[in-house]
Amino acid sequence: MSEPRQILVTSALPYANGSIHLGHMLEYIQTDMWVRFQKMRGNQCIYVCADDAHGSAIMLRAEKEGITPEQLIANVQAEHSSDFADFLVDFDNFHSTHSEENRELSSLIYTRLREAGHIATRSVTQYFDPEKGMFLADRFIKGTCPKCAAEDQYGDNCEKCGATYAPTELKNPKSAISGATPVLRDSQHFFFKLPDFQAMLQQWTRSGTLQDAVANKLAEWLDSGLQEWDISRDAPYFGFEIPGEPGKYFYVWLDAPIGYMASFKNLCARRPELDFDAFWNEGSKAELYHFIGKDIVNFHALFWPAMLEGAGFRKPTAVNVHGYLTVNGAKMSKSRGTFIKARTYLDHLQPEYLRYYYAAKLGRGVDDLDLNLEDFVQKVNSDLVGKVVNIASRCAGFIHKGNEGVMVSGDAAPELTEAFLTAAPSIAEAYEARDFGRAMREIMALADRANAWIADKAPWSLAKQEGKQDEVQAICAQGINLFRQLVIFLKPVLPVLAADAEAFLNVAPLTWSDHLSRLENHKLNPFKALMSRIEPAKVEAMVAASKEDLLATQAKAPAGNGELTKDPLSAEIEFDTFAAVDLRVALIVKAEAVAGADKLLQLTLDIGDERRNVFSGIKSAYPDPSKLEGRLTMMVANLKPRKMRFGVSEGMVMAAGPGGEEIYLLSPDSGAKPGQRIK
């Protein structure tokens, strides 16, 4: 038998500035399932994580709440820890980036990079808020777009026309924090020389460490040439001061991934059998896996391995990237009640329902996963209650009534036993490859065969016949053994169901290799219901509660903090001015990302008798543009065509929202037809 593997696993660090929601849980649940599988196989698999606890956003929120940043992150960490535990995410350690271990490791890595010549310094001109006494990041500056004159745009890009620009190009800039007019000031900044690692990264990203789609995307960055990365921020800032540089702090994205190392080091201090150097030093034989969302690939697959290489540490074995979560086919929405916090879900439903549904839909790619709430109810009820638990509930009673709870020996269905044994390696292979959906399909196919066999034998009918009791016991003992096999296969996904089944089966905690054995002449404990069906009313209540969360948040907001306050009405115009704008219904025929543009989608629009090509800065809200195809929207059809770097834009689609992920493409009511005028 091969030696147990040494594996260290991480999930992306949740930001200590808000609650965990079901989109976050998609990552932590899949990581936890993979870790549980490895532990069941007898491998030494350590799962660490931490709260990402630094940055201006945390500093400003703490100030707003009248508490220290330390108090804020402690409160959030307690909330996060509770949510993870109740979702059965079993970290070996959940730490914080605001820790001594992280301070020491961040300083060490920076010092090594500096001594190796990988740190540069130069003066940077930035906007400075004279009222707050702080430099402003791009997202803390708002003003008028220098290209299209749209108001209330961020300091790095226009959400209306898609233009990108430097903050200094913004017209009428204002601090988003204080409302003051910022002034330009120079500041000395520190840069990590990422281009020094171009050759290494080109090889490493193509070495099997990433999914092909991710490696292909990173190739665009690599082919265009890497840029030096600004790793410093000026005081005031909540984070770690750069060694020997008073008033200069590490940018949050420098010390955040180092938080993986820090969390593990914190665990090593409490677990003497763990050796930090054996996992992190160059040449380590241990395996290191990061599970992350596709929005932070650049940090984990370019900056992070380059930092590790430059500082003399090992690089990840693989970075496993997943897509986003949608609910009912659309982005999570607070107004629709589909922006569901982890705690709101837990207040209404069992965590294993969602764990199973995620597992059933997760593949090894980076596609988005849709939580369709109707399908969620149907699938969990059908698969877990109607198939898996049904086997035990069908058979247990006959064994207790007819043989005092003792399973007879013998194999009543050798061909079925062999089918389960034969399937085990394939299921294990699917788990290992993170192809959880395939694993669940294969497991449920076995459950279908077991149920069909029991239904064909009909022990409930035989029990009524004279002299058939031995046959009944043989059938039901076989059924319980098949149920036990299914529990073993599902244990990484459903740890509570497995623990309850182990109690009923009267066995020690099941390991993966236990699928090779059977229970013979074995005493069972009394059967208790292992899982109840999802009641649709509870799902509806969860959605309603999520809407109430939004209303409660709005109720807490001070008067005058609504959308009109943030974005006041424009000056009145004459009707003729409005009438000059030709608004039309448009059918989105094709939607695709624009290569080399971070914000833009290219839309092909049908407006009845002709088609238009339109570039729109809505990519952040619609990461899978193909889902827009076939949808009706509204456009400005008589806007003068505008030549852009990527082509000519022949109009503008209509959308609402402040920007970023909160952009909502407008749609006409059903029945509208492409080309119809909007009046």
Swiss-Prot record:
Keyword Cytoplasm annotated: yes
- GO cellular-component term (any): cytosol
Q: Could you tell me where this protein is found in the cell?
A: Cytoplasm
Q: Name one GO biological process term.
A: methionyl-tRNA aminoacylation
Q: Where is this motif: 'KMSKS' region?
A: 331-335
Give UniProt keywords alphabetically. Aminoacyl-tRNA synthetase, ATP-binding, Cytoplasm, Ligase, Metal-binding, Nucleotide-binding, Protein biosynthesis, RNA-binding, tRNA-binding, Zinc
Pfam families, alphabetized: Anticodon_3, tRNA-synt_1g, tRNA_bind
Q: State which Enzyme Commission number(s) the record gives.
A: 6.1.1.10
As to how many cofactors bind and how, the note says:
Binds 1 zinc ion per subunit.
Identify which cofactors the protein needs according to its UniProt entry. Answer: Zn(2+)
Which residues are involved in binding Zn(2+)? C145, C148, C158, C161
One GO molecular function term? methionine-tRNA ligase activity
Give yes or no: UniProt keyword Zinc: yes
Q: Which residue ranges does the record assign to the tRNA-binding domain?
A: 577-679
Question: SUPFAM superfamilies of this UniProt entry?
Answer: Anticodon-binding domain of a subclass of class I aminoacyl-tRNA synthetases, Methionyl-tRNA synthetase (MetRS), Zn-domain, Nucleic acid-binding proteins, Nucleotidylyl transferase
Known partners and oligomeric status:
Homodimer.
Q: Which NCBIfam families match?
A: metG, metG_C_term, PRK00133.1
Q: What does this protein do?
A: Is required not only for elongation of protein synthesis but also for the initiation of all mRNA translation through initiator tRNA(fMet) aminoacylation.
Question: What is the protein name stated in its UniProt record?
Answer: Methionine--tRNA ligase
Q: Which organism is it from?
A: Pseudomonas putida (strain GB-1)
- Its gene name is metG
